[in-house]
Amino acid sequence: MEFSQKLYQAAKPIINDIYEDDFIQKMLLGNIQADALRHYLQADAAYLKEFTNLYALLIPKMNSMNDVKFLVEQIEFMVEGEVLAHDILAQIVGESYEEIINTKFWPPSGDHYIKHMYFQAHSRENAIYTIAAMAPCPYIYAELAKRSQSDHKLNREKDTAKWFDFYSTEMDDIINVFEALMNKLAESMSDKELEQVKQVFLESCIHERRFFNMAMTLEQWEFGGKVND
């Protein structure tokens, strides 16, 4: 079994939990609250900006020009392509995506997730650690979306179904590249090192779950007390 497949197998319980959590279940039914979607979009805009920067940090770690070219293309996709999925949710909220994200928001769950990825990028020379931290994002979105396609609860009469349709196909290219890179880099690593990479991957899976849940709880920073002067 290739290393990437071992990671996916280990992540299955977490992905199952994400699928059964309120965010995805309400998205399937099409009855998710507008406030939750607004919260998600504002947080995701901040997250994706940093995720794009992480692609740029990966480029110097690449040995192949083809890999560099693909990462540059992914930066373009993050800036332009994924806006289609965001527009779907913004229309449900009843506001333009630009209006929604004009309110800057950096929730605890997004903060911790991004710092986890930046730590790998800055503290590890081997690119596999950064890739392992980033890879769960597209992989989990794709897995959730593909599972939804055969779920009788997916309400085709609601616009949220279009969000699942988008992610059921649009993540495939980056998933395949991340898989190939991780599998290639894993070949020269010890079992102990691969366990560390696995830990990084699974931690990002947990961060993904917390990110979705953040939207449902309208997560804010809590510094103690009702008023902080």
From Swiss-Prot:
Residues that bind substrate: 44, 141, 167
Site (Increases nucleophilicity of active site Cys): 47
Active site: 137 (nucleophile), 208 (proton donor)
Pathway of action: Cofactor biosynthesis; thiamine diphosphate biosynthesis
Catalytic class of the enzyme: hydrolase
InterPro entries: Haem_Oase-like_multi-hlx, Thiaminase-2/PQQC, Thiaminase_II, Thiamine_Salvage_TenA
Catalytic activity: 4-amino-5-aminomethyl-2-methylpyrimidine + H2O = 4-amino-5-hydroxymethyl-2-methylpyrimidine + NH4(+); thiamine + H2O = 5-(2-hydroxyethyl)-4-methylthiazole + 4-amino-5-hydroxymethyl-2-methylpyrimidine + H(+)
Pfam families: TENA_THI-4
One example GO MF annotation: thiaminase activity
GO cellular component, one term: cytosol
EC number(s) given by UniProt: 3.5.99.2
Alphabetic keyword roster: Hydrolase, Thiamine biosynthesis
Gene Ontology process terms (BP): thiamine biosynthetic process; thiamine diphosphate biosynthetic process
Family: Belongs to the TenA family.
Subunit record text: Homotetramer.
PANTHER family: BIFUNCTIONAL TH2 PROTEIN, SI:CH1073-67J19.1-RELATED
Function description: Catalyzes an amino-pyrimidine hydrolysis reaction at the C5' of the pyrimidine moiety of thiamine compounds, a reaction that is part of a thiamine salvage pathway. Thus, catalyzes the conversion of 4-amino-5-aminomethyl-2-methylpyrimidine to 4-amino-5-hydroxymethyl-2-methylpyrimidine (HMP). Is also able to catalyze the hydrolytic cleavage of thiamine; however, this thiaminase activity may not be physiologically relevant. Therefore, is probably involved in the regeneration of the thiamine pyrimidine from thiamine degraded products present in the environment, rather than in thiamine degradation.
The name this protein goes by in its record: Aminopyrimidine aminohydrolase
Species of provenance: Staphylococcus aureus (strain bovine RF122 / ET3-1)
